[in-house]
Amino acid sequence: MLPVIPSFRSLVFATACLAALAGCAGSVPPQIQRLPERVELNSVPFYRGDMYQGAPQSLAAVLTSQGTVITPGLLEKPLHLPGGEAGLQQNMQTLAREYGLVVYPLDSDLSALLEQVAAGNPVLLRYTEGTAFWSGPRYGILAGYNRQKRTVLLRSGMNRRLLMSFSGFESAFKDAGGWAVLLQRPTQLPANVNPQRWLKAADELAGAGQEQAAARATKTLGATH
């Protein structure tokens, strides 16, 4: 007769499996667990290229997604390339404001980035690319993620769909300084917007000579808060 009560060894094995599964689920922050399981922003364009740390390609892709017809080559001179690689982070933000976009900085944690992607906002960021023998900064666009597989999807360099694990991406992202921004139209609030941060970004837009765009950004926030 087959035993009805499982053996002690079977119970131990089953308990261990359940504990392992619970541990895996618990390792993902609650803020991420609440997001949709999988998102990919297919409308975000991709410009292939490795030159200048991928900055012109990434910026052109975000500008295009916001309605500006532009190519990476047209951005090289305004970004002071070649020769201005050290100032790319600041120059990209300055140029985005000249196109009338609000440069909204994000917190440097994964949940904050994925929250924006889930809301349909591509994230412009910098991360470290390389190996144990060589590494360097690279700009890219966070355009998707898979919560179950714990991967993010980047538009970067020669890869339209560069997949990285959550942990690998977080390490590369923070190693490069944890810089990430949204480039938003003045009427397009980020998900879970921080009012003070948005108003500061609007002031910076006005300081770049885009007073009307800055006024629209302020009005948009006032209509919802």
Language model features by range: what are they?
Residues L2-F13:
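Bacterial N-terminal signal peptides that target proteins for export
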Residues A16, L95, V117, W134, ...:
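A generic structural signal for short, solvent-exposed coil/turn residues
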Residues L18, Y127-A132, Q184-T187:
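Short, flexible beta-strand-to-coil junctions
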Residues A25-D109, L113, A119, Q188, ...:
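Cysteine-nucleophile protease catalytic domains, especially the papain-like/related folds used
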Residues A25-V28, Q148-H225:
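Noncatalytic regulatory segments and standalone regulatory/sensor domains
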Residues V102-R155:
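Active-site-adjacent substructure of cysteine-protease-like catalytic cores
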